[in-house]
Design a protein with these regions (language model features):
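Short secondary-structure transition hinges
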Residues: 102-144
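Amphipathic alpha-helical segments enriched in hydrophobic/aromatic and basic residues
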Residues: 32, 41-42, 53, 63, ...
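Amphipathic alpha-helical packing segments from all-alpha helical-bundle domains
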Residues: 76-79, 126-153, 163-167
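C-terminal peripheral helix-coil segments that are non-catalytic and often amphipathic
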Residues: 1-9, 98, 105, 109, ...
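Short hydrophobic/aromatic patch on the recognition helix
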Residues: 49-60
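Basic, helix-initiating cap at the start of DNA-binding domains
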Residues: 1-35, 40-51, 65-68
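Hydrophobic alpha-helical connector segments
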Residues: 69, 73, 83-111, 162, ...
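Conserved hydrophobic residue
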Residues: 38, 156-157
Length: 206
């Protein structure tokens, strides 16, 4: 899992014209940021962009399909930032600390810098869109990779099953990944990453 991939099942129909699809997504992002995701219909979007509703349906089968693409772009931005931070160190314990810190900071910044776009993130989390499922699976895989490195280096214990350990850490991290949960934890984001990662690292000591 070295590359960040776009989930193949995100609905996209019609001509493989990436420029037009990108144009629709960019215009939709701007429109949603002004008027909100829930209040916007495909007809509203078509009128704002200057395309016909039927033309948009050649590329996306629903409003959710457009929302998923916007969601993918946002999650890719967060994930890229985290992976860059993790790649800067060879020490597994430090990688875990950065996982907690950067995921929290990047999610907070991206999800709440635009309250209208937050609607998309909230819908994605509430309805468990495939883009979110794929993102969560990649986060768990990244945790497993770091845990495996730590076990090989002797930094982490080896008795607990790897997948069980990764899931437990993911559940600790999840309130700072999921926008629905993060909105209720914003007052702890200054201290939580350091405190939680320290607690996790103590539990991983061999």
């Amino acid at each position: 899992m070295k590359n960040i991939s776009t989930p193949s099942a995100v609905p996209a129909r019609g001509p493989a014209d990436h420029e037009v699809r990108d144009q629709i997504v960019a215009a939709a992002t701007e429109h949603f940021s002004r008027y909100g995701y829930e209040k916007t219909t495909v007809s509203d979007l078509a009128k704002a962009i200057g395309f016909s509703k039927a033309y948009i349906y050649k590329f996306f089968e629903s409003k959710q399909a457009i929302g998923e693409m916007i969601c993918i772009n946002c999650l890719r931005e967060i994930e890229s930032e985290v992976r860059a931070a993790v790649a800067e160190t060879d020490l597994p314990p430090e990688k875990l600390r950065r996982i907690f810190k950067v995921f929290t900071d990047a999610s907070l910044r991206l999800f709440f810098r635009d309250r209208k776009l937050y609607d998309i993130a909230a819908s994605a989390a509430t309805e468990n869109w495939q883009a979110v499922q794929a993102y969560e699976a990649r986060v768990q895989q990244l945790l497993q990779e770091i845990l495996q490195e730590g076990r090989q280096s002797g930094d982490f214990e080896r008795k607990t099953p790897l997948d069980e350990t990764a899931m437990a850490i993911y559940l600790v991290l999840r309130p700072y990944l999921n926008p629905l949960l993060l909105q209720y934890n914003r007052d702890t984001t200054d201290v939580a990453p350091a405190q939680l990662s320290s607690l996790v690292l103590r539990s991983l000591s061999p």
